[in-house]
Amino acid sequence: MKLESNGVAFSYPGRDVLKDVTFTFEGPQLVAILGPNGVGKSTLIHCIDRILRPTKGTVMIDDRDTMDMKMKEMAKTVGYVPYASSDTFPMSVVDAVLLGRHPHSNWRSTRKDVAIVYDILKRMGIDDLAKCQFNELSAGQHQKAMLARGLVQEPKILLLDEPTANLDVKHQLGVTKLLRDLTRERKMLTVMICHDLNIASKYADSIIMMKDGTIFAAGSAEDVITRENIETVYDVKCRIIDDGGRPHVILQDGTL
């Protein structure tokens, strides 16, 4: 599946957020979006998912304008997991995750739907929480359950806004590796906003680095994760070492 952004711009009254964002990605691959706070990363994800309508430009999926796609078709094609969602439904974890099957089941869950949910819960390492109350989970458990809900939707394109927020280092690595593996298994295109440069470098197939509402650099980790790019975009000193063929960032004290 191909995802294109053609000259996408978005503005709030008196403030331009996105400016001429253009890219093309085809699955299966994991794409990481990097950049400081406030550069338009979440706004870009919202434009892709039609939460926001671009002020200019188009978002295309397999050469079709997303604005021309019916809502149910979009729901089957694109999944979205927001940043640190505050959803706290008074229901079991398994029932909360089952909501992700709605585009396929029309609210009538089948045995297949339940089996898909339990499989993802197991792979996320939270199958033991299936009968727990969703609104009683810790922040990290809640984040994993929200990711599970996005994954059981079985979208062709999965959009993730900081999917490892609220997770400790071990689970950040585990979840990102699982996302990469599922992306390949399911032949998905996964696009995730990430603030950890080294996790993005380690697991992403392609990286977008944003600055001032547009794409500053794009390509492989080797192309994007460079000292010059990081110092320009983040205004911090760093050095880069090789970590098994991937760049690894070591931050240094002080700003430029």
Place the predicted regions along the sequence by residue.
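The feature captures the beta-strand-to-loop junction immediately N-terminal to the Walker
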Residues: L34-P36
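Helix-to-loop junction immediately C-terminal to a conserved catalytic motif
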Residues: D49
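Conserved ABC transporter NBD signature motif
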Residues: G57-D65, M74
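Conserved ABC ATPase "signature" region
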Residues: L98, R111-L129, E154
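Conserved ABC ATPase signature
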Residues: Q133-L137, Q141
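Catalytic Walker B motif of ABC-type/P-loop ATPase nucleotide-binding domains
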Residues: L158-E162
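ABC ATPase nucleotide-binding domains
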Residues: V233-L256
